């Protein structure tokens, strides 16, 4: 009965009506099983460390998601994106080309897809058109009783090269960009961490073990990335109607900046928003490991912000943030924030 419930959870999330606006970004184990021998399909196992159990979907290449990150010692940033050139090299070494349809999977144990989503984000930045995440990853494959193998496919390296006009360089935003948008009515900021992290009740440390600042980016609202799950056990993605309800108040006509601590969790929220049809979505990949670094003079607050009148608070002079007494602003007050003004994505 438990198995049937889990099976229904992820199958219904993919085949439900109305479908996700960008339903091409998600697939089921059953669909993959029936298309496994398609010449255009490349299956990509992105699990790493203890989350990789040594068994793979037949024909899969193994490219740990962590290969796309490195520790930037110059900027004192842990686990940051390796960059466009290196990302293309990693994909090429795995025998992947621009014309391939890439099926990305990890495992339920890895936050229900929050590493597959990081690779999805990388592919989105590179402008790779044909990509899908396997709903519930290797777990869904196992639950269907499909065959597995113990050796990854090791193809000959190929040239993976995106055209300059295809790469979304403007998607690679940093703290300075986010800071300049704090008063811009076009941008909405969403903190996808836990409520405890958002309110500054729980802190983390930077690359050198120095405690990061507590709180969140001013004007940001908190929508935990886990709220896209149907439940914490199966970690299946909610049907479209459920996602619409949770993200009510987020304006799809505006830019949305999502962040977490290191860019991994926010990549999942990025994926969910893309699945829902949002186009102007940006992952602040350096996230709190940059913004919360005490060496950087970015303002923080611990007072929660709420969505009001279906509009994100704090993004215009007409709509201000509704703040409760549950928290307080940091010592860096609002006067340190920039004046309102539109800055293009190229800033």
Question: Predicted segments — roles?
Answer:
Residues 1-9:
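Bacterial N-terminal signal peptides
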Residues 11-15:
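Sec/Tat signal peptide C-region and signal peptidase I cleavage site
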Residues 16-42, 49-188, 192, 196-347:
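Rhodanese-like catalytic fold shared by cysteine-dependent sulfurtransferases
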